Amino acid sequence: MRVTLKSDNIFKTVCLACGAAVLILTAGFFIQLLWASSEAWSRFGLELLVSSDWDPGNEKFGALPSIVGTSVTTVIALLIALPLAFAASLFIVDAPKKVGMILGYAVDLLAAIPSVIYGMWGLFVLAPLMQKYIQPFMVNTLQMDKIPFVNSNYNGFGLFTAGVILAVMILPYICAVLRDVLQMTPPVLKEAAYGIGCTKLEANKDIILRYGIRGVLGGIFIGLGRALGETMAVLFVIGNMMNMPKGIFDSATTISSTLANNFAEADGLQRSVLFALGVILLLMCLGIQITSQSFLHVTKAKRGEK
């Protein structure tokens, strides 16, 4: 009994220390970034968030193009990846066991591909395809340039191409969560839905997804967090222009690609501004996590769970 009690206390202490270490590391990252970016915040204040200037020679800096680029590419990635992940998950779960297993492994392998490989594929394969076929089809045939924020000028690079790359990269993460949600749904729910005449689409959309909405939201926010911080793949295809984009086909930049492009030779005020961009990115990621937990809490309360 004494040995068991002692081991429980040791285990509790170790777990507490690990949990505290996570909090200390997170706080340490944030404090270090704030301290390193203090010169930028004292010089520009909140104006840094709304300025689009970027002229290191005259010490004019603005984070708005990077923030907009990060947000737009992430939204494009989610809009593309979510329906694909949902359709792939449904097919994998409903397919014969061996077929579903092979397809599941194939989707999971996408997560194992290094981001630099995605970037090279985007540079040498996707960007030329975008310039020659996809973007002309979207503009000339579908006439999508009439939609706000879809411009008629394109060169294969830009926000849309970066969003497509990110969609492929976050697809396996969202798909894995959705597969688990679909597989954990009690069979009686499906049988009841089919029994009252629901189609397969209606059963999955109105019954199963609602039952596993917490898992679905978790998968969405996992993909969102993954897309926000991606650097190398985006760096290859976004165009790396420190200008405010006028459309999704414009070359632009993201926070992470701005850091990768400028940090090596930056010093003085520019280095402090780059640390400030790191603070902004960290706050965006923390905001996503807080929002996801809030959504899950609200959903849990609506379902009457404790």
Predicted regions and their residues:
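Transmembrane alpha-helices
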Residues: L109, I113, I117, I174-L178, ...
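Membrane-interfacial helix termini and adjacent extracytoplasmic/periplasmic loops
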Residues: S42-F61, Y118-V168
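Membrane-cytosol interface at the C-terminal ends of specific transmembrane alpha-helices
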Residues: F86-F91, L142-G195, T199, I207, ...
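Interhelical loop and adjacent transmembrane-helix boundary motif
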Residues: V234-L282
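Transmembrane alpha-helix signature in integral membrane proteins
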Residues: F61-F91, I220
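Cytoplasmic-entry segments and transmembrane alpha-helices of multi-pass inner-membrane transporters
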Residues: K12, A87-G122, G304-K306
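C-terminal transmembrane helix and the adjacent membrane-cytosol boundary/short C-terminal tail
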Residues: R179-Q183, P187, N261-K306
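Transmembrane-helix boundary motif in ABC transporter permease subunits
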Residues: V3, A77-V107, S292-V298
